[in-house]
Amino acid sequence: MEKLDKLSEAFKALLKQEKFSSQSEIVTALQELGFENINQSKVSRMLSKFGAVRTRNTKMEMVYQLPAELGVPTTSSPLKNLVVDIDHNDVLIVVKTSPGAAQLIARLLDSMGKSEGILGTIAGDDTIFITPTKVTPVEVLMQNVTELFESSF
């Protein structure tokens, strides 16, 4: 197996343990596995490459984790735990998430579509803008989105 493949496999195996809360902890663990040339910037690039996000593990600790493979996220997936706050004005709804989770949650919201009153979303790292299909019922859409993630509040 090529050296990069071994590094990628070791990196994925470490993240599956769901116990690393910082990039420096991942660097140390990889160095202990024999990857002595690894540094924080390489770990940062690998986290981005594999789409890793920080989320809460079963012990409620914020740790790096690989996203679930394929498929549209559902409301029964742990994404509910990643929503921090939902607010709105007269035109838009803003959803605040844990760092790195906004695009996954926006994908779920986009899959709901116009039938649920969502014209579209724009997601950054930890913020989602939701545009309703009509300006008037923004409060109704706000209530629907809040109910979708109500277990987070």
From Swiss-Prot:
One of its GO terms (molecular function) is arginine binding. One of its GO terms (biological process) is regulation of arginine biosynthetic process. Keywords: Amino-acid biosynthesis, Arginine biosynthesis, Cytoplasm, DNA-binding, Repressor, Transcription, Transcription regulation. GO terms for cellular component: cytoplasm. The keyword Transcription applies. SUPFAM superfamilies: C-terminal domain of arginine repressor (SSF55252), Winged helix' DNA-binding domain (SSF46785). It is found in: Cytoplasm. InterPro entries: Arg_repress, Arg_repress_C, Arg_repress_C_sf, Arg_repress_DNA-bd, WH-like_DNA-bd_sf, WH_DNA-bd_sf. Pathway: Amino-acid biosynthesis; L-arginine biosynthesis [regulation]. Pfam families: Arg_repressor, Arg_repressor_C. Belongs to the ArgR family. Regulates arginine biosynthesis genes. This is Arginine repressor. It comes from Actinobacillus pleuropneumoniae serotype 5b (strain L20).
